[in-house]
């Protein structure tokens, strides 16, 4: 696992991680940034949209729902996470990136998906 990842800033449509600017939605899996994250149903995150995260078996999943918070997790995903003992934290991206940083630097097994726009 990478131990030095740091989300430095977020503004609508842009996230800076370790000095690199990302302008499309991203996932962070075991400390590795996966850029160009697209979901099958746009603002709805379902199990198929995060298979790579689920395979990494995180204890916590942080979802950044965008600036106004339009992105949501599906009921099927919420049930799956609960049944598999994975804590889900859904927040507007402006708060979620800070939550991720705090948990990651505490040594938690945390992964994330961030919607960078609406």
Locations of regions flagged by a protein language model:
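Short amphipathic alpha-helical segments and helix-helix/interface helices
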Residues: 50, 77-78, 100
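Alpha-helix C-cap/termination motif
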Residues: 55-56, 106
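A short, acidic, amphipathic alpha-helical segment used as a generic capping/interface helix at domain edges
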Residues: 45-55
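Non-catalytic interface/targeting segments
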Residues: 1-46, 102-118
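Short acidic loop-to-helix transition motifs that present clustered carboxylates
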Residues: 93-98
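Generic secondary-structure microfeatures
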Residues: 26-32, 57, 65-67
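Mid-chain, well-packed structural core segment of small domains
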Residues: 58-91
């Amino acid at each position: 696992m990478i131990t030095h990842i740091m989300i430095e800033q977020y503004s609508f449509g842009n996230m800076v991680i370790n000095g690199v600017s990302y302008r499309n939605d991203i996932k962070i899996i075991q400390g590795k940034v996966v850029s160009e994250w697209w979901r099958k149903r746009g603002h709805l995150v379902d199990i198929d949209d995060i298979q790579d995260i689920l395979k990494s078996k995180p204890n916590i999943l942080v979802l950044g729902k965008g600036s106004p918070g339009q992105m949501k997790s599906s009921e099927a995903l919420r049930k799956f996470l609960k049944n598999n003992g994975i804590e889900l934290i859904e927040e507007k991206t402006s708060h979620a990136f800070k939550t991720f940083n705090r948990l990651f630097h505490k040594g938690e097994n945390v992964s994330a998906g961030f919607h960078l726009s609406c």
